[in-house]
Regions:
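N-terminal subdomain of nucleotide-sugar transferases
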Residues: 2-29, 35-40, 50, 57-58, ...
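A charged, aromatic-enriched C-terminal amphipathic alpha-helix characteristic of glycosyltransferases
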Residues: 341, 492-530
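Catalytic binding pocket for nucleotide-activated donors in carbohydrate/polymer assembly enzymes
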Residues: 432-494, 498, 507
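Conserved active-site histidine-acidic residue motif and adjacent donor-binding/catalytic loop
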Residues: 239-247, 391-395, 407-423, 436-437
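Acidic donor-binding loop of glycosyltransferase active sites
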Residues: 257-261, 424-437, 449
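Conserved catalytic-core segment of nucleotide-activated headgroup transferases in glycan assembly
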Residues: 171-183, 319-404, 412
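C-terminal alpha-helical cap of glycosyltransferases
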Residues: 514-552
Length: 552
């Protein structure tokens, strides 16, 4: 007979076991055993109820919002959040069939936002994303918005609209907007910035969202002030109407401003941007893809900032006749970098050697191989400390560090708005393997932090970090022993750390500055327009998936 802890562990892993063995422990005089047995039994019953709720929704063709909300609540409670997105998208699709367009797209936005926020499986499936795009396109066609003017305007300066889901001083989009505003060629282009405010609570909403963001006027106050100084117009959708009214307002504003090229820095979680991407609001439309594309048929080009995702998707876009590009998002060396934080404020001794890694998906990049290597390093160097910076639950990694006896020397800083300045507190940057977040590597290099990277393979996601850091900071092949030796050498030798850090900064200045990113984006806008307006063949985009910027 299985022990209580074995049964509880199986239930926690999501197994649907027979609850009969738990009944023995439910009558135990030991209060702890009684609690665990009843809790495990209740989780089994809830999972069964969850399955019945799915069948209930299917029986009524996903038409009852109250039942859907009950299903969502149970999904969250039993830890099966991955299963909530599909039924919610089906609910939205059925609402669209009933011509309840606002309810439909807001339900779909809720589902996609949650899935992306929790790195769910639904949006990792391209077929699901195409289904979502199809629903947005149905609404865009049914609403009946049309451009009362011809979009074939011709200006001396090419007018570029940067459309984002929200302005924030502490995220990558906000930093990119600020960098573009400082570095774009104002003699050839005119830049306008638009925020859909899709995540902000509106006065009229048909379907509540999971969470609501702060309006850009508050969250992006510094960015808006900077744009005003740079004479870049910023416009935000009004919040006094519902989602469809906001989409129409944005479309009307884009037409009034006679925009030539729109850069949508958005995902499918932005229903307002998805509708505008389908309407004739500009001469050309480009999706800047950080995570997943918008998959809208109204786009002329998908521009990736992640080379691995670009390589995975390029054949798909080629088959659909859509241009796809990869552009490196460099580091803005003109951006004001905050001073290094005081170590004592974080309980870190001044004599400690601080190692760090940064990323937007640490659960994925902090692999078992990397954690085992890190444990070896921490055991060999008692004065060393490791600091995780970025997003991720890291529950499995925390258990691994605790069981290895180094848990007290591993810190978790979470998502920081003061990057890359926060990385100055570290002495050494460790690029995770097999894959890492290349943005973290570049940020560390920009503040003169020495980097150690491993080229795990030739795939872009396994070699991006080493490609940025260069051969001087790279371990060739899957050699954890050499990686540990290199890190140990840098821990022991402050002079070597300082020298390598300077060379990292020089490498960024020479090859990975944001100035190059700006020039490539300007080039992309010109090529897209020339391709649409019949420019000369040598200037047109003739190869659908050719990267504009290669990593040296």
């Amino acid at each position: 007979m299985a022990s209580l802890m074995e049964l509880v562990e199986r239930v926690n892993k999501g197994e649907m076991i027979d609850p009969e063995p738990l009944e023995v422990y439910e009558e135990s005089p030991n209060s702890a055993e009684k609690f665990l047995a009843h809790h495990a039994h209740s989780m089994i019953d809830l999972r069964r109820a969850h399955q019945h709720m799915v069948q209930c929704l299917e029986a009524i063709d996903y038409s009852d919002q109250k039942v859907l909300n009950q299903f969502v609540s149970i999904s969250a409670f039993v830890g099966q959040a991955d299963l909530r997105c599909g039924p919610m998208v089906k609910f939205g699709s059925c609402a669209i069939n009933r011509r309840e367009y606002g309810l439909g797209i807001e339900a779909i936005q809720n589902a996609v936002t949650y899935d992306l926020m929790h790195s769910g499986s639904y949006t990792r499936d391209r077929e699901n994303c195409l289904l979502v795009a199809q629903q947005y396109e149905r609404v865009a066609a049914s609403i009946g918005w049309c451009n009362p003017h011809s979009s074939d305007w011709n200006h001396k300066l090419t007018r570029i609209a940067y459309v984002t889901s929200g302005l924030s001083d502490d995220d990558s989009t906000g930093r990119m907007i600020g960098s573009l505003a400082r570095q774009y060629d104002s003699n050839r282009f005119k830049l306008n910035v638009y925020s859909t405010e899709c995540g902000v609570r509106r006065e009229r909403q048909s379907f509540a969202q999971n969470t609501y963001g702060i309006p850009s006027s508050k969250r992006g106050k510094d960015t808006l002030e900077m744009l005003n100084r740079m004479k870049v117009t910023a416009w935000m959708t009004p919040l006094d109407g519902e989602t469809i009214a906001a989409a129409k307002a944005l479309a009307d504003q884009l037409v009034r401003d006679q925009i030539d090229v729109i850069l949508f820095d958005c995902t499918q979680a932005d229903s307002i941007a998805a509708l505008c991407a389908m309407w004739d609001v500009a001469r050309a439309k480009v999706n800047l893809c950080r995570r997943t594309p918008m998959y809208s048929s109204g786009l002329q080009c998908i521009c990736y900032f992640d080379q691995g995702r670009f390589e995975n998707d390029r054949e798909f876009w080629s088959r659909r006749g859509v241009d796809s590009k990869y552009i490196l998002e460099g580091v803005d060396l003109e951006e004001t970098i905050t001073a290094a934080p005081n170590r004592s404020a974080y309980g870190i001794p001044e004599s400690a050697v601080v190692m760090t890694s940064s990323g937007s998906d640490l659960d994925r990049t902090m692999s078992d191989e990397f954690c085992d290597t890190l444990i070896n390093i921490l055991r060999s160097h008692p004065q060393s400390i490791y600091l995780c910076v970025g997003e991720g639950e890291l529950s499995a990694q925390k258990r691994k560090f605790e069981s290895a006896g180094v848990g007290k020397r591993v810190g978790y800083a979470g998502k920081r708005k003061d990057l890359p300045g926060f990385l100055r507190m570290a002495d050494l940057y460790l690029a995770e393997f097999p894959s890492c977040d290349p943005a973290g590597v570049l940020q560390a290099m920009s503040v003169e932090r020495p980097v150690v990277a491993m080229r795990w393979g030739e795939a872009p996601e396994q070699s991006a970090g080493s490609a940025f850091a260069g051969p001087e900071a790279t371990i060739s092949g899957r050699d954890s022993t050499t990686y540990i030796e290199r890190v140990s050498k840098l821990i022991r030798e402050p002079g070597s750390r300082k020298q390598l850090g300077k060379s990292m900064r020089e490498r960024v200045e020479q090859q990975f500055a944001f100035t190059q990113t700006t020039r490539h984006l300007e080039q992309l806008c010109e090529q897209i327009l020339q391709g649409r307006t019949g420019g000369s063949s040598d200037q047109m985009i003739t190869e659908g998936s050719e990267p504009l910027a290669e990593v040296a």
